[in-house]
């Protein structure tokens, strides 16, 4: 059985259909990418899966249990976590405290009660801190633990948000354009981290415009266009699909893939 199954999901905003009849599966241990031009419905799909939006129709199953219409908190509790296009950290907290917030989803006391530091909860708070430090170290951020979040560079904020998502110990991690705004070295580091996350047992579903990264990381790719799936399969199959080539190369696209547009260079990637 797949870890995640999306069946016939549809969502509209007024007269605009954002996603329509979207169906796909994500196997446990897989890195699956969702790609498509701007406005294809990728982030809307992520928002539906993670509970920020409710679908007009369709069903979402996670670990053989329907999570359709669940709140974001319920979905996080079920074992699914996500990051966003624009990192959203608590700027009044340091890096470690931000990651500890994510870890509180896996505790009995929760963030607010632990923050009150009642005697019976101090032991759990120490365990939360230790676990958060481990996730920072895994992401290569241990040296920034006490650093103010508001003073971080953009790429560092992205990595802290990823560490915070990992602190929830998800079985499925959704990454929404994780490479956006990163330089070449940061993208390389991100790719290595995503592989390590998968290698330790976390399944990954990502939306990304950097096609070099997508082709390098993904086991399977779903392509959306105007909210509708047009292709699905391994990278080599998707690269050569006539519908995908038509969508991305139908006009006179000259930009490099790292700029958010697919190019002939990508289509010809060996």
PLM features: residue spans?
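Glycine-rich phosphate-binding loops of nucleotide-dependent enzymes
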Residues: 1-270
């Amino acid at each position: 059985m797949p870890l995640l199954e999306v069946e016939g999901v549809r969502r509209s905003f007024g007269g605009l259909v954002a996603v329509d009849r979207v169906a796909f599966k994500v196997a446990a241990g897989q890195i699956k990418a969702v790609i498509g031009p701007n406005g294809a419905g990728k982030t809307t799909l992520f928002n539906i899966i993670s509970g920020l939006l409710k679908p007009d129709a369709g069903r979402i199953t996670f670990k053989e249990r329907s999570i359709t219409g669940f709140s974001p908190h319920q979905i996080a509790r079920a074992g699914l976590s996500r990051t966003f296009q624009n990192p959203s950290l608590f700027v009044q907290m340091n890096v470690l405290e931000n990651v500890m917030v994510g870890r509180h989803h896996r505790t009995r006391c929760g963030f607010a009660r632990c923050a009150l530091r009642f005697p019976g909860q101090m032991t759990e708070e120490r365990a939360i801190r230790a676990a958060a430090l481990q996730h920072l170290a895994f992401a290569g951020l241990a040296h920034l633990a006490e650093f103010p979040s508001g003073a971080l560079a953009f790429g560092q904020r992205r990595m802290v948000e990823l560490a915070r998502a990992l602190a929830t110990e998800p079985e499925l991690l959704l990454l929404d354009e994780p490479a956006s705004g990163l330089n070449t070295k940061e993208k390389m580091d991100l790719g290595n981290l995503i592989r390590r996350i998968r290698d330790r047992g976390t399944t990954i579903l990502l939306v990304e415009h950097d096609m070099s990264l997508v082709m390098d990381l993904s086991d399977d790719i779903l392509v959306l266009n105007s909210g509708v799936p047009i292709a699905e399969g391994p990278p080599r199959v998707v690269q050569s699909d006539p519908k995908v080539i038509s969508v991305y190369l139908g006009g006179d696209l000259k930009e490099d893939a790292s700029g958010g547009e697919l190019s002939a260079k990508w289509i010809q990637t060996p």
